[in-house]
């Protein structure tokens, strides 16, 4: 899909789903790693991750476009455009847009757990990136002692 085809697709979705024109730029940004797209507040442009189109197809991309257009139209109407706002959640439901996009497999910033602790009282497992001082910290569920298993 070319940039012109993407621009036309975003304009069509905006008219059909929202009944309003999209008057700014839509483009692919291959630098996006962990997100499907983003709405830029200062320029009102929308950037989309081309990997989502490659890996998940056009339907996933259309969902991401609808999600970003929710941010776009609410921001221009001076309504709540954040994920936490009621206006945003309501508009997502109205246009059948997803709240989250599919995760890209093998994303570069996946969390690697190096240390594994187990509570001696209740058996709860705690995976941590950083080491924990077991003499200072206890289990949050039962106040039991922590025992280091891995790391």
UniProtKB/Swiss-Prot annotation:
Binds 1 zinc ion. Keywords: Cytoplasm, Metal-binding, Zinc. GO terms for molecular function: zinc ion binding. Zn(2+) binds at residues 67, 71. SMART domains: SprT. Residues 6-150 form the SprT-like domain. Its main location: cytoplasm. One of its GO terms (biological process) is response to stress. It comes from the Bacteria. It is found in: Cytoplasm. The keyword 4Fe-4S does not apply. Its cofactor is Zn(2+). Pfam families: SprT-like, Zn_ribbon_SprT. GO terms for cellular component: cytoplasm. The keyword DNA-binding does not apply. InterPro entries: SprT-like_domain, SprT_Zn_ribbon, Uncharacterised_SprT-like. The active site is at 68. Belongs to the SprT family. This is Protein SprT-like. The lineage of its organism: Bacteria, Bacillati, Bacillota, Bacilli, Bacillales.
């Amino acid at each position: 899909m070319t940039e012109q085809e993407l621009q036309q697709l975003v304009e069509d979705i905006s008219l059909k789903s929202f009944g309003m024109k999209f008057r700014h730029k839509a483009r692919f940004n291959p630098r996006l790693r962990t997100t499907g797209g983003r709405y830029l507040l200062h320029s009102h442009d929308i950037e989309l991750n081309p990997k989502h189109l490659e890996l998940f197809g056009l339907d996933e991309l259309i969902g991401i476009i609808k999600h970003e257009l929710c941010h776009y139209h609410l921001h221009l109407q001076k309504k709540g455009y954040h994920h936490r706002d009621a206006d945003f959640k309501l508009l997502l439901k109205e246009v059948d847009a997803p709240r989250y996009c599919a995760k890209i497999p093998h994303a570069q910033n996946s969390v690697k757990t190096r240390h594994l602790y187990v509570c001696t009282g209740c058996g709860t497992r705690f995976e941590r990136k950083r080491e924990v001082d077991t003499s200072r910290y206890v289990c949050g569920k039962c106040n039991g002692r922590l025992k280091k298993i891995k790391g």
